[in-house]
């Protein structure tokens, strides 16, 4: 148990990223992520200015893309799942 229920469902024209999860674990699609400019490592992306909102069966990440990096950016690896704090 604890595996992902479903991979992320995203919309290219929306600011909402819906993440289906199970056992408090989820993964993020790279559709709304931008590659890290400060690293040359492949597979690392950054989600800027985000906030988590919990709903019945999914999480919604609301974000505002900006140029450069802010204090509340989150770097992840493609396909990586992690715990919700």
Swiss-Prot record:
Give the superkingdom in one word: Eukaryota
Q: Which GO terms describe its biological process?
A: meiotic cell cycle
Where is the signal peptide, in residue numbers?
none
Keyword Cytoplasm on entry = yes
Where does the UniProt annotation locate this protein?
Answer: Cytoplasm; Nucleus
Q: Which UniProt keywords apply?
A: Cytoplasm, Meiosis, Nucleus
An example GO CC term for this entry is: cytosol
Q: Does the record's keyword annotation contain Cytoplasm? A: yes
Function noted in UniProt = Has a role in meiosis.
| Protein name from the UniProt record | Meiotically up-regulated gene 144 protein
- Species of origin reads Schizosaccharomyces pombe (strain 972 / ATCC 24843) (Fission yeast)
Gene encoding this polypeptide? mug144
């Amino acid at each position: 148990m604890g595996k992902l229920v479903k991979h992320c469902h995203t919309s290219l024209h929306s600011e909402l990223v819906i993440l289906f999860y199970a056992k408090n674990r989820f993964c993020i699609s790279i559709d709304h992520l931008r590659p890290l400019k400060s690293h040359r490592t492949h597979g690392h992306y950054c989600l800027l200015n985000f906030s988590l909102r919990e709903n019945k069966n999914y999480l919604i990440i609301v974000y505002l893309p900006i140029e450069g990096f802010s204090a509340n950016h989150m770097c992840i690896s493609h396909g990586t799942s992690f715990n919700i704090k």
